[in-house]
Amino acid sequence: MGLKTYWSQFPGLRERLLYYGQFLADKITQLGGEVFYYGLADCEEAGRECGEYLNASNVDLIFAHSGTYVNSASILPIHQICKAPVVILNLQPTARIAYDRTTTGEWLAHCGACPVPELSNAFHRSGISCRIINGLLGLDHTPAISLTDENTAQRPEAVKAWKEIGEWVKAAAVKRELSGCRFGFLGNTYN
């Protein structure tokens, strides 16, 4: 998730968020999930397209990464179209921004928590339940564009978040497996 108007103002921000998204998709795949990665929903039109894409893909669960600020009008259409349960991933790339050298673009790359209250409220008002996983992104390196240390893979906040994500992946797999099962049952018969 991100805000389309940022891309021309802050070079590299869009690509950086897409990189984080691909990292998440790859890691969820490693946990056993089949991932349908749309990319960035950054405006209402993209939100509708994303909702149609996820709905057509018949997903069991939506992990929505709050990469930077995004307005709820861009994200709400996704979940109005695709009714799969949503888990907002409020995963910060770093534990601490290097404020002494940061820029607005750098700050926005670490502003993932900003839209979470707005999104939660919009979902609530629309009758859409959501869950939130808070923590750190869990990269094992720092991208070249970053002005701060993003190597957080071993930090407890990342380990805990990825444990929770893994539990959601397993739960979705169980639901998918059981929804395809057909059971026959013959109770006590009387002769």
Q: What residues fall within each predicted segment?
A:
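An N-terminal assembly and electron-transfer interface module characteristic of large anaerobic redox
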Residues: 1-191
